[in-house]
A protein has these predicted regions:
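Internal, well-folded beta-alpha domain core
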Residues: 66-67, 73-90, 98-209
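Short amphipathic alpha-helical surface micro-motifs
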Residues: 2-4, 96-99
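Conserved small/polar residues in nucleotide/adenosyl-binding loops
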Residues: 213-215
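Cofactor- and metal-binding active-site motifs of prokaryotic enzymes
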Residues: 1-63, 109-122, 126-128, 210
């Protein structure tokens, strides 16, 4: 769970109701991931939501755009506020529906750290140019390679293996990876064989050096 607000003064002002975004980052049946939005009266209203993986949430609207959350949690690490807030403000001016400030996300040493939903990809040390690239690529169904630190639905080993295979195969579609399996020091990354063919897959085996994985 991430706590979010809009950059600047508007994000510090009281408002009517609470925005809730529900990211279905993976699905039980292999179907597409998706993002939903709905309002609740207050934080207690979260307890009334019946959220089920891959299933529509009652009263929620499915969104046709991603969310880009930029960590500005200065109490966790001052670098997140110092580097995150200017980036969040600049990106919010360009993409007001997409960009929010967020509470701590992993990897504050990579500030400004950010998360792209609904796919749950993390990014670090992005310039304004690359942050813009992350958003625009996501809107076209592409994972932006620069600064990408892995997809949070996988283990750290799986995240490293996925990115290694994506770079080797030069494939960056958000839906190109069928699954990632990790067993000890070996990972198997399964890619779909082409954007239009989901019946055929290609398997890549990756040898992991666990001491070198820093996600």
């Amino acid at each position: 769970m991430q706590l979010i607000r809009k950059p600047g003064r508007i994000g510090q002002q009281p408002c009517d109701g609470v925005n809730v975004y529900i990211a279905h980052c993976e699905s039980a049946d292999g179907s597409e991931v998706f993002l939903e939005h709905r309002m609740v009266a207050d934080v207690k209203g979260l307890m009334t939501l019946d959220i089920r993986l891959g299933q529509p949430t009652e009263g929620a609207t499915r969104l046709d755009h991603p969310l880009f959350l930029i960590c500005t949690h200065g109490k966790r690490d001052r670098c997140c506020a110092i580097k995150g807030r200017p980036l969040a403000a600049a990106m919010h001016n360009l993409y007001p529906e997409v960009v929010w400030e967020t509470s701590h996300s992993k990897g504050h040493r990579f500030a400004p750290a950010s998360v792209l939903l609904p796919w749950n990809y993390s990014f670090g040390r992005l310039s304004a140019v690359d942050a813009k690239g992350v958003i625009e690529d996501a809107q076209r169904g592409i994972v932006h390679a620069e600064g990408c630190r892995g997809r949070g639905i996988y283990t750290p080993q799986g995240q490293a293996a996925e990115l290694a295979v994506r770079r080797q195969a030069d494939t960056w579609g958000v839906d190109d990876v069928a699954r990632v399996d990790v067993d000890g020091t070996t990972a198997v990354v399964v890619l779909y064989d082409g954007p239009s063919d989901r019946d055929k897959v290609v398997e890549y085996e990756v040898a992991l050096e666990l001491s070198l994985i820093h996600i």
